[in-house]
């Protein structure tokens, strides 16, 4: 599970953070501490890049945030068969996957461009970077110490 602040307040996002603050990520190991396979990591990396371009959104200026979220999506893809949002707590992950609401891209992202994980940020978001791409090496480097 990851936790971070967003600049848009909504029922799905925490309160806005003041300008100039850095976004941070806290991570807990997934079920049985399993790591994402390279195949799932690459699938989620490509998906994230394509969706960012298609939705005119950008990755966080702090690339480690992007890397951790993509790794979390890949972990869930391996463990659950679907890219369930890794930034939320679930009592029953399998039921959440079946419902589909929090499968990436989640309903709030598709309907209102509100990404709780800060993976897909609108250009006006204080934490939005300039990039819509990230390499597999960047993801592995950023997540290797977690």
UniProtKB/Swiss-Prot annotation:
[4Fe-4S] cluster binds at residues 85, 104, 106, 115. Its main location: plastid. Residues 1-26 form a transit peptide. Its EC number is 1.8.7.2. Belongs to the ferredoxin thioredoxin reductase beta subunit family. Catalytic subunit of the ferredoxin-thioredoxin reductase (FTR), which catalyzes the two-electron reduction of thioredoxins by the electrons provided by reduced ferredoxin. Its cofactor is [4Fe-4S] cluster. The record marks 116 as: Increases the nucleophilicity of the active site Cys. This is Ferredoxin-thioredoxin reductase catalytic chain, chloroplastic. The keyword Chloroplast applies. The lineage of its organism: Eukaryota, Viridiplantae, Streptophyta, Embryophyta, Tracheophyta. GO terms for cellular component: chloroplast. Disulfide bonds join 87-117. GO terms for molecular function: 4 iron, 4 sulfur cluster binding; electron transfer activity; ferredoxin-thioredoxin reductase activity; metal ion binding; oxidoreductase activity, acting on iron-sulfur proteins as donors. Binds 1 [4Fe-4S] cluster.
């Amino acid at each position: 599970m990851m936790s971070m602040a967003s600049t848009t307040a909504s029922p799905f996002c925490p309160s806005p953070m003041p300008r100039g603050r850095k976004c941070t990520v806290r991570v807990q190991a997934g079920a049985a501490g399993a790591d994402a396979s390279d195949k799932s990591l690459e699938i989620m990396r490509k998906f994230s890049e394509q969706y960012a371009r298609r939705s005119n959104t950008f990755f966080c200026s702090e690339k480690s945030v992007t890397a951790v979220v993509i790794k979390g999506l890949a972990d869930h893809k391996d463990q659950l068969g679907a890219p369930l949002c890794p930034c939320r707590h679930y009592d029953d992950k399998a039921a959440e996957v079946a419902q589909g609401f929090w499968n990436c891209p989640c309903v709030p992202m598709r309907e209102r461009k509100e990404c709780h994980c800060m993976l897909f940020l609108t250009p006006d978001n204080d934490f939005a970077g300039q990039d819509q791409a990230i390499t597999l090496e960047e993801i592995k480097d950023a997540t290797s110490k977690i």
